[in-house]
C-alpha cells in the first residue's frame, strides 16, 4: 500500500465513481491508468480490485441497481489524447469486485459508459468510442438483453463514429 499512489489515483487519474445504493461508505473508482479501486470507508482507504486482469485502463464503472453485488466495468480510458491506454471490452463482477469476467466488446478499446436497466438486470447498454486513431473496431451504442452474454449494436454507423455518453 502506497499512500502517494492512492492520492494520485484519487486526484489525477479518476475516470468514474459508482457509490453503492444502500451503503454510502462503499465506492468503486475506475481510473484511466490504475485499474479499479474500492473503498468501504467513504474514501479513507482504497484497495485495488482489478490488478489481475488483462488491462489496467478503465473508463467507467456501474453498479447494478437491482443487485449491488454486480459491478460493470468498461475498459479503456474515456478521454482522448495521445497518452491514453486502450482496454479490451466490458467486464462484470458478481461478487462486489472480488473476481471479474470479460463479457465481450473486446474490439471496442474505449468503453465510456454502461447503464443497467433499473428494473431488469438483463438489459444493459454500453457506449463504445472504438479505436481512437484507426477506423473500425466495435464502436457505437450496444445493448444486451441477456445480462451481457451477447451484444447488439443499436446506434452507430461509420467506421470512425463512436458513442461517448448515454
Question: What do these predicted ranges mean?
Answer:
Residues 13, 57-59, 86, 110-112, ...:
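Beta-rich catalytic cores
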Residues 26, 35-38, 45, 88-92, ...:
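A short loop-to-beta-strand structural motif that recurs across blades of beta-propeller domains
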Residues 1-11:
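Single conserved hydrophobic/aromatic residue that forms the stacking wall/gate
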Residues 8, 50-53, 104-107, 155-158:
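Surface loop/turn motifs at the tips and blade-to-blade linkers of beta-strand repeat domains
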Residues 81-88, 133-138:
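Short, solvent-exposed loop/turn segments at conserved positions within beta-propeller repeat blades
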Residues 29, 73, 126-127:
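Residue position within the beta-strands of beta-propeller blades
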